[in-house]
């Protein structure tokens, strides 16, 4: 559990932004989850969220950020996320 800071994207954050967000208490930064949750809420749906942290923030890794890294990590996480949601949803 932690604090998720949502941005509109579509660009990765800069190291300066990450530093500021960290000082503000953000544990994770992302471009998805919140917009989808807002639309679902506006439609009257109950909303919950589970996120996959797909990459280290700008300035936190030895290599530059890339969409390929995000996609690869998401693919690797898919089986575990599927299992988690399959077990969780019947309990809601």
Segments (PLM) and residue ranges:
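Glycine-rich phosphate- or other oxyanion-binding loops that anchor nucleotides, phosphorylated ligands
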Residues: 1-52, 56-62, 67-92
